[in-house]
Structure formats: structure tokens, C-alpha cells
């Protein structure tokens, strides 16, 4: 979707003015122009190389993390993988050639490769944007119908959806471009088509409007509608839980036999717990809004300007300067670098990234010495971050983990004890909230429990089938620690 952009003519023009002003020598003007042109090329090359590096590194990391971490191989992450593949192809085969076209100001590889490059550009852009739309619909179904989602969205259906997205993208890109359905009859456009050094994507009105609607405007409208519904559903479910929670803590204030001292901190004072949980609900609502705002804000900021000028350009080619069109096009390319950051913000992804970047074998040995389960043959623990593990010895950073046996120092033991106590304090709050969900919500309202989990972890699957089991496991862990 890119146009060529010639470097600016930096040399001064010859002028003859009154008053006997003399022009600078021609040789000095040429040297100055060449020097400025070289500086411009060096600066643009460095900037575009940075964009390519960010796109490739980020998406390779996402694909490797999902492929090598069993915990991340979920249905939603199938769509994330498809998105990362589209962005990776963009970073490897589209953006570098576009950077060469911008820096050199001419196409170096002939007309046929120009059409192939343009087709690949449109293919990756369309696949990336439509996959973002599919992810939005997937999260909408998971949040609004959590139990129905389990049977509605299977792995086979997810693969069919991904293949459909790529097929639609190919129909919008390769078919019309290679068949020359996109070409215009404008004399300036015809001159570009006949020049092997020109690779400007000058299209007719029908193709520009149709491709923009299919590739961007329809997905944009769907994403706006879906994410508005997701946020409204989030607020409604949080209010519903808050109302039920009031009844729950009201019942806790009735006279009860005094508990044993060591069991007293589990639920604490009813009113204080209610205020604390209300604050937690407000924080979750804020986090959901923040996540949705980041998703829609970055996507719209990156692609809306380009697709607006893409429509305007076919009606009046002189209205939008070439440099502005190219800038908006590269702003859209930058979205491929932002996607891994936005859609892989979960703790599971961050842990997988750390394992990939920080010598995983060494990290596995430290985890094993710290009391974690033995790693699988692939070198990764299948239940990374699972609540069933013992409280101590969690892997938190690249240099984390503790050394067992007689080599452990007193300071390390104290540090491990502090981490365990801090984790147990968090589990007390989780236990109280989970007990409330499982005991005081009826069968129909258990979906609320799953909904809140999916709202807070918007792009992770949450276990929704047996919250009672989760409660019992955490309760058993607490009693084991107290013993």
C-alpha cells in the first residue's frame, strides 16, 4: 500500500535579483545538496531499520513463546499467532522493500516484483486488521457467554476462521492486483505503470473504495461495536457481583462463635472486606477500560489516517502531499510493532518471554532447586504459574530462584519466607472472594465468576467449569501453610 517518496531537493535554486546579488558557485551547491541527501538517506535508513527490527523481534518472540509454552496454546492465542504471522511477514518482506523505495526514491526490481510486493503488502495489512477484528469477536463471546463459548469456539472452528481471514485477504490483494483490476486510466498513472522504476500504487476509485471498506472500515465498525458491548457487559457484571456481595457480607455480620486466632484473618471484618472488595471491583473496571482503550486507540491512530487519505487521494490526487501519504502508510506499518506489546501483556506471556531471553535451561535448574516440579522434556514447566504449586520458590525474573541444600544462606531463607507470607496474604483475599462466588451465587450466576476473570485477564482463558474445586485447593494450601 506504499507509494514511492523522492528525497527532498535540498539544493538552493538559482536566483537573480536586483541590487547585484551574486549566486553561489554551482559546484558548492552540488556538494551541499549531495551532503544533505546523504544525511537524509542515513537518517531514514536508521529509522526504518529500527521499525523493521521491532516488528520482526516482537512477533518472532510471540510465535516462539506460544509454540514452546503449553500453557499459552489456547484458542485465543491461535488468533494471536495468526496476527503475529501476518505482522512478521510484513516486517520481513514488505517493510524492508518499502524502506528501500523511500530512501532511494525509485524501485529497483522491475514491474512484476513490484506487483508481487504490492499484493503481499495488501495481503498482510488486510489479514492483520481482520485478525484484530476476529480477536475482538472472540473476546466478546467469551465474556458475554462464557459457558456457551466452550462449545461454540472449538479448535477446529478457530482454524477455519483463520483460513477464512487469509482467503478473504488474498481475494482483496493478489487476485485484483495481478489481474490489473486496480489500474486507473489517468495519464499520470499510465506513465507510472510503464516505468519499471515507479512502484506507486495508483488505483482507480472502485478498487480504492472497495478494498478500504473490506480491509479497514468494516473491521473498525465491528471492533467499536464489540468493545463497547464488552465494556458495558463488564460494568453490568461487576455491579451484579457488588449487589450480591452486599448480601453476603451482611450475613457475615450476624453473631457467630469466636473463631480460633490462627483462622481469624481468612475473612476478617465484614465491612472492611466489603469496602476492600469494592475497591478491587473498581480497579478491575478501570483496568478493563484501560485495556480496551489501548486496543482501540492504537489501532485507530495507526490505520485511520492512512485509509482516510487513501479514499481522498482517488478523488483529488493533489490534495494530499506525497510525503504525508507515505508517513501515514508507515504509521500503519508501525501497528505491526505495537500488536505484540498490546495483545501479549499477560503475566503468562511475560514469563514465557523471560524464559526465552534469559537462558531457559539455567532458569529451569534454578526452579528445580527451589522446589518447583521437574521440567518437561521440552524444557518448560507445563503448569507455569499454576496455583496448585507450593507457595515458595516462584520464578519471578531472569535471575530468580533459590539454591537448595546446605548452600542456601540465612538471608535467602528469610527472603523466601517473606515471599511466602506475602503470597499467603494474597491467597486469603482470593479465598474469601472465591468462597463468596461459589457459595452465594446460584447456578445461573456462576457465569458471573467466569466473566469477571475474563474481563480482568481480557486475553487469557479462565477456568470456569469448577470454581468449587479452585476454592478447596486454595483452602487446603492455606491450612497446610498454617500447620
UniProtKB/Swiss-Prot annotation:
SMART domains: 7TM_GPCR_Srsx (SM01381). Pfam families: 7tm_1 (PF00001). It is found in: Cell membrane; Early endosome. The chain crosses the membrane at residues 39-67, 77-103, 116-137, 156-179, 206-231, 286-315, 321-343. Residues 1-26, 250-270, 387-425 are annotated as: Disordered. It comes from the Eukaryota. Glycans are attached at residue 14. Residues 410-425 have a biased composition (Basic and acidic residues). Disulfide bonds join 114-199, 192-198. Beta-adrenergic receptors mediate the catecholamine-induced activation of adenylate cyclase through the action of G proteins. This receptor binds epinephrine and norepinephrine with approximately equal affinity. In dorsal pons neurons, involved in the regulation of sleep/wake behaviors. This is Beta-1 adrenergic receptor.
Amino acid at each position: 500500500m506504499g507509494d514511492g517518496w523522492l528525497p527532498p531537493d535540498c539544493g538552493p535554486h538559482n536566483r537573480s535579483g536586483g541590487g547585484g546579488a551574486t549566486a553561489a558557485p554551482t559546484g558548492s551547491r552540488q556538494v551541499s545538496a549531495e551532503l544533505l541527501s546523504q544525511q537524509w538517506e542515513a537518517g531514514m535508513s536508521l529509522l526504518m531499520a529500527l521499525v523493521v527490527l521491532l516488528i520482526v523481534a516482537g512477533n518472532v518472540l510471540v510465535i516462539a513463546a506460544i509454540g514452546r509454552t503449553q500453557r499459552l496454546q489456547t484458542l485465543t492465542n491461535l488468533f494471536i499467532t495468526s496476527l503475529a504471522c501476518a505482522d512478521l511477514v510484513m516486517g520481513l518482506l514488505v517493510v524492508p522493500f518499502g524502506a528501500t523505495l523511500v530512501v532511494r526514491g525509485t524501485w529497483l526490481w522491475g514491474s512484476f516484483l513490484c506487483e508481487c510486493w504490492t499484493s503481499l503488502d495488501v495481503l498482510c495489512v488486510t489479514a492483520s486488521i481482520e485478525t484484530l477484528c476476529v480477536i475482538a469477536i472472540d473476546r466478546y463471546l467469551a465474556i458475554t457467554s462464557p459457558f456457551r463459548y466452550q462449545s461454540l469456539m472449538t479448535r477446529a472452528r478457530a482454524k477455519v476462521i483463520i483460513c477464512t481471514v487469509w482467503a478473504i485477504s488474498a481475494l482483496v490483494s493478489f487476485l485484483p492486483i495481478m489481474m490489473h483490476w486496480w489500474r486507473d486510466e489517468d495519464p499520470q498513472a499510465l506513465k507510472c505503470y510503464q516505468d519499471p522504476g515507479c512502484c506507486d500504487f495508483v488505483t482507480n476509485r472502485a478498487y480504492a473504495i472497495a478494498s478500504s471498506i473490506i480491509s479497514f472500515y468494516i473491521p473498525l465498525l465491528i471492533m467499536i461495536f464489540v468493545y463497547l458491548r464488552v465494556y458495558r457487559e463488564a460494568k453490568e457484571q461487576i455491579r451484579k457481583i457488588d449487589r450480591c456481595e452486599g448480601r453476603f457480607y451482611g450475613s457475615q455480620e450476624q453473631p457467630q462463635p469466636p473463631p480460633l486466632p490462627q483462622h481469624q484473618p481468612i475473612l476478617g471484618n465484614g465491612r472492611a472486606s466489603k469496602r476492600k472488595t469494592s475497591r478491587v471491583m473498581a480497579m478491575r473496571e478501570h483496568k478493563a477500560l484501560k485495556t480496551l482503550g489501548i486496543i482501540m486507540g492504537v489501532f485507530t491512530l495507526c490505520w485511520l489516517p492512512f485509509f482516510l487519505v487513501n479514499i481522498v487521494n482517488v478523488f483529488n490526487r493533489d490534495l494530499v502531499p506525497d510525503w504525508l501519504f507515505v508517513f501515514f502508510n508507515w504509521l500503519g506499518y508501525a501497528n505491526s510493532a505495537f500488536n505484540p506489546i498490546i495483545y501479549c501483556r499477560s503475566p503468562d506471556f511475560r514469563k514465557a518471554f523471560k524464559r526465552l531471553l534469559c537462558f531457559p535451561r539455567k532458569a529451569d535448574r534454578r526452579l528445580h532447586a527451589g522446589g518447583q516440579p521437574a521440567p518437561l522434556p521440552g524444557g518448560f514447566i507445563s503448569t507455569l504459574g499454576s496455583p496448585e504449586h507450593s507457595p515458595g520458590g516462584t520464578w519471578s525474573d531472569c535471575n530468580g530462584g533459590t539454591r537448595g541444600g546446605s548452600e542456601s544462606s540465612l538471608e535467602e531463607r528469610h527472603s523466601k519466607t517473606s515471599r511466602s507470607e506475602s503470597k499467603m496474604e494474597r491467597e486469603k483475599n482470593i479465598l474469601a472472594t472465591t468462597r463468596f462466588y461459589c457459595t452465594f451465587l446460584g447456578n445461573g450466576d456462576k457465569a458471573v465468576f467466569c466473566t469477571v476473570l475474563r474481563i480482568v485477564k481480557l486475553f487469557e482463558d479462565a477456568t470456569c467449569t469448577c470454581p468449587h474445586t479452585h476454592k478447596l485447593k486454595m483452602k487446603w494450601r492455606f491450612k497446610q501453610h498454617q500447620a
